[in-house]
Amino acid sequence: MTFISQAPSVSISSAGPSDYFALLKPRVMSLVIFTALAGMLIAPDPVHPIVGFASLLAIAVGAGASGALNMWYDADIDAVMKRTAKRPIPLGRVMPNEALAFGLTLSFLSVFTLGIVANWLAAGFLAFTIFFYVVIYTMWLKRSTPQNIVIGGAAGAFPPMVGYAAATGHFSLSSFILFAIIFIWTPPHFWALALGRSEDYRQAGIPMMPNVKGAARTRLEILLYTLLLAPLGVAPWLLGFASFVYGMLSIALGAAMLFFAARVYIVQEGPSADRHAKALFGFSILYLFLLFAEIVVERLVPIVVAMGAWLTSGMFPGFFH
């Protein structure tokens, strides 16, 4: 007689590396790296390259962990929405329990690594950021209030403050200004997208602003937030931690952002209304990228030039003198 032991069945998928990489939300992770780098570079003293690289890696992993935990919890609504139906869990390529374990493991590793290579203030704030995104936004706000993206958007705005804290061991007004720019940018960015996908959100039961307050109210709030964003984007120059070039760029970009937002508010019906909302969504990405790219470039170029001069003079002292 053959005895077969009965054990609890555990769902295990045949997921590959690309599936787990998709759980990290790489597009969001790249934005986190970029904004955290900007926060790190505005620190008054330069951070050691190895410490800086390791800190950015830890912050990126923390952002990826948040994405994995978000997909684990939102698997039910991801399967309903067209935009998210092809994510690894709805497709059955990654089991929910695997995504949960993956996200929790990366969360611990990212926080612990940042604490070791930088400092525990930055690590603690990274842990808080993960908690805020997963628990406050994903588990609570997202399904309960049309202000979900307003309050929850703080999680996506924290990386510059984490980067600054990793470089200095404290926070500053300058890092908070970068946080505020992303925080105020988030509602018009996501509501412009939500205007064209309100039916998708309705089917998933997510109370986005267009579904709860209507398209007209959403368009008005997009304009109001953009009116706040335009002068706020100039603040780094006015406060002295960004250059004149940044100041002129931020003024031009702010004016363009206002133009796109005003069109969304004025044209509320017909094919042009949807087209203007999509245009605002696309430009908002360019707006944030160019603002932070200018900060990164103007801080990195002197560092790269100085390192190049040091390397060439050290390696070929006779040739360059």
Swiss-Prot record:
Q: Which GO terms describe its biological process?
A: heme O biosynthetic process
The protein's topology relative to the membrane is: Multi-pass membrane protein
The entry lists its GO molecular-function terms as:
protoheme IX farnesyltransferase activity
GO cellular component entries: plasma membrane
Pfam families named among the record's database cross-references: UbiA
Q: Which reaction does it catalyse?
A: heme b + (2E,6E)-farnesyl diphosphate + H2O = Fe(II)-heme o + diphosphate
Q: Where in the cell is it found?
A: Cell inner membrane
InterPro entries per the record?
A: Protohaem_IX_farnesylTrfase, UbiA_prenyltransferase, UbiA_prenylTrfase_CS, UbiA_sf
Q: What is its EC number?
A: 2.5.1.141
CDD domains, alphabetized? PT_UbiA_Cox10
Uppermost EC category: transferase
Q: Which UniProt keywords apply?
A: Cell inner membrane, Cell membrane, Heme biosynthesis, Membrane, Transferase, Transmembrane, Transmembrane helix
Q: In which pathway does it act?
A: Porphyrin-containing compound metabolism; heme O biosynthesis; heme O from protoheme: step 1/1
Residues spanning the membrane: 28-48, 49-69, 94-114, 116-136, 149-169, 176-196, 222-242, 247-267, 277-297, 300-320
> What more does the record tell us?
Carbon 2 of the heme B porphyrin ring is defined according to the Fischer nomenclature.
HAMAP family, from UniProt?
A: CyoE_CtaB (MF_00154)
Q: What does this protein do?
A: Converts heme B (protoheme IX) to heme O by substitution of the vinyl group on carbon 2 of heme B porphyrin ring with a hydroxyethyl farnesyl side group.
User: Which family would the database say this protein is a member of?
Assistant: Belongs to the UbiA prenyltransferase family. Protoheme IX farnesyltransferase subfamily.
NCBIfam families from the UniProt entry: cyoE_ctaB, PRK04375.1-2
Q: What is this protein called?
A: Protoheme IX farnesyltransferase
Native organism is Beijerinckia indica subsp. indica (strain ATCC 9039 / DSM 1715 / NCIMB 8712)
Underlying gene: ctaB
